């Protein structure tokens, strides 16, 4: 089922999400709905707070980028109770433009670490403890930020935030257009 995307201004986007128990009701259906919602919105990542649930569940599908990133062919994963454990301080930082389904029409350059250590459960509730780098590390950080009550514009410079304040205000007030169902 395609769910509405919660946009900036919805309180759930500013809450720290809770870990869920492994017997969370209808988890597989929730993950399936998140994948369907993300695909219908032309996204590559979606966190549960973006659909109004303050729980630590994220889906990422990088297959649409596989023409530019062949290593992501067929890549789609769910992350249950994910946490960033550590950032590789020796790895370089990288700056790239980011956008977000919860901030329609806003794109800004964000600087992030290129290598992170994460722990999570997969869709079968199997534990993973791994270092992730490159573009996947960026997408994970963006989505995991939602679980901590942050959006990507929290990570831009105050000067850039000032320049886009009217766009942010418009999204916050529900004055925007996009091609997917939203809740503002």
Describe each region flagged by the PLM.
Residues 1-141, 146-184:
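Active-site rim/adjacent substrate-binding subdomains
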């Amino acid at each position: 089922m395609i769910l509405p995307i919660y946009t900036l201004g919805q309180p759930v986007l500013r809450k720290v999400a809770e870990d869920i128990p492994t017997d969370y009701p209808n988890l597989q259906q929730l993950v399936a709905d998140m994948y369907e919602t993300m695909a219908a919105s032309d996204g590559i990542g979606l966190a549960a707070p973006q659909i109004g649930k303050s729980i630590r569940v994220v889906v990422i599908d990088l297959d649409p980028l596989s023409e530019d990133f062949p290593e992501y062919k067929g890549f789609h994963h769910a992350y249950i109770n994910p946490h960033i454990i550590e950032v590789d301080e020796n790895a370089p930082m990288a700056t790239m433009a980011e956008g977000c389904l919860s901030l329609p029409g806003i794109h800004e350059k964000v600087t992030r670490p290129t290598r992170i250590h994460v722990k999570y459960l997969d869709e079968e509730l199997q534990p993973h403890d791994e270092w992730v780098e490159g573009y996947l590390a960026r997408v994970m950080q963006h989505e995991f930020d939602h679980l901590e009550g942050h959006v990507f514009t929290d990570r831009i410079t105050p000067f850039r935030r000032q320049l886009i304040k009217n766009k942010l205000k418009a999204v916050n007030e529900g004055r925007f257009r996009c091609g997917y169902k939203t809740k503002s």
